[in-house]
Amino acid sequence: MSLLTEVETYVLSIVPSGPLKAEIAQRLEDVFAGKNTDLEALMEWLKTRPILSPLTKGILGFVFTLTVPSERGLQRRRFVQNALNGNGDPNNMDRAVKLYRKLKREITFHGAKEVALSYSTGALASCMGLIYNRMGTVTTEVAFGLVCATCEQIADSQHRSHRQMVTTTNPLIRHENRMVLASTTAKAMEQMAGSSEQAAEAMEVASQARQMVQAMRTIGTHPSSSAGLKDDLLENLQAYQKRMGVQMQRFK
């Protein structure tokens, strides 16, 4: 796997699923391929994106700045600086300085990533902030190692909390989670169906599912009533795709 492919993988792992993720993936691909060279416009676009946490925006801004060639005197962006200040905690800053000194001795992406993984997310963010604010310099490869270590830690904690939600025995949370998944699946079906005539059926199924979820939320239903809702929808979607000549082996 190439270095940039690895960086893209790690960075996208912390972006929530949805149309915005697809857009960010496209921007990263363009940047890494050297197709997007307007850092100013890129940062302005990133700053105004909804949903993303300040830290995720900070990490993306850092990656764009590392990759897109820019004039020497280009102003650093406040939204990135604020996200990469380790919550203003002096302990994070102290650790970030120690980490920075170690990173200066590293020359490879994997070496830097290994060193960085033993630090907290706050210290890692602060260290990125040091480099972003030009208080320190490391090679691009080492900086990418730092980025990927940070993303790995964030993705780990997201995965833990997601697993807790999925395996929770609380029926109300499971019920709500199934309804949310059914609703987003229905939304995806509507987007995929487009405007062809054969799509009317898929649109109808999706629309009914969303109305059903709305009704279930409005009147309050037994927690087990949502079981299988998303799977039913996915079966419908696969049947529709088969008729359209699209064969997707895995959608679950």
UniProtKB/Swiss-Prot annotation:
SUPFAM superfamilies found in the cross-reference section: Influenza virus matrix protein M1
Q: Where is this motif: Nuclear localization signal?
A: 101-105
Where, per UniProt, does this protein localize?
Answer: Virion membrane; Host nucleus
According to the UniProt record, where is the region RNP-binding? 165-252
Q: Which GO terms describe its molecular function?
A: RNA binding; structural constituent of virion
Q: Name one GO cellular component term.
A: membrane
| Membrane-binding, as annotated region | 1-164
Q: Name one GO biological process term.
A: viral budding from plasma membrane
Chief localization:
virion
User: Record's InterPro entries?
Assistant: Flu_matrix_M1 (IPR036039), Flu_matrix_M1_C (IPR013188), Flu_matrix_M1_N (IPR001561), Flu_matrix_M1_N_sub1 (IPR015423), Flu_matrix_M1_N_sub2 (IPR015799), INFV_M1 (IPR037533)
Bilayer topology term: Peripheral membrane protein
What are the alphabetically sorted keywords of the record?
Host nucleus, Membrane, RNA-binding, Viral matrix protein, Virion
Q: What does this protein do?
A: Plays critical roles in virus replication, from virus entry and uncoating to assembly and budding of the virus particle. M1 binding to ribonucleocapsids (RNPs) in nucleus seems to inhibit viral transcription. Interaction of viral NEP with M1-RNP is thought to promote nuclear export of the complex, which is targeted to the virion assembly site at the apical plasma membrane in polarized epithelial cells. Interactions with NA and HA may bring M1, a non-raft-associated protein, into lipid rafts. Forms a continuous shell on the inner side of the lipid bilayer in virion, where it binds the RNP. Determines the virion's shape: spherical or filamentous. Clinical isolates of influenza are characterized by the presence of significant proportion of filamentous virions, whereas after multiple passage on eggs or cell culture, virions have only spherical morphology. Filamentous virions are thought to be important to infect neighboring cells, and spherical virions more suited to spread through aerosol between hosts organisms.
Q: What else is known?
A: Most abundant protein in virion. When expressed alone can form virus-like particles in transfected cells.
Q: How does it assemble?
A: Homodimer and homomultimer. Interacts with NEP. Binds ribonucleocapsid by both interacting with genomic RNA and NP protein. May interact with HA and NA. Cannot bind NP without genomic RNA.
Q: Which family does it belong to?
A: Belongs to the influenza viruses Matrix protein M1 family.
What HAMAP family has UniProt attached to this entry?
Answer: INFV_M1 (MF_04068)
The protein, known as: Matrix protein 1
Write down the species.
Answer: Influenza A virus (strain A/Duck/Hokkaido/8/1980 H3N8)
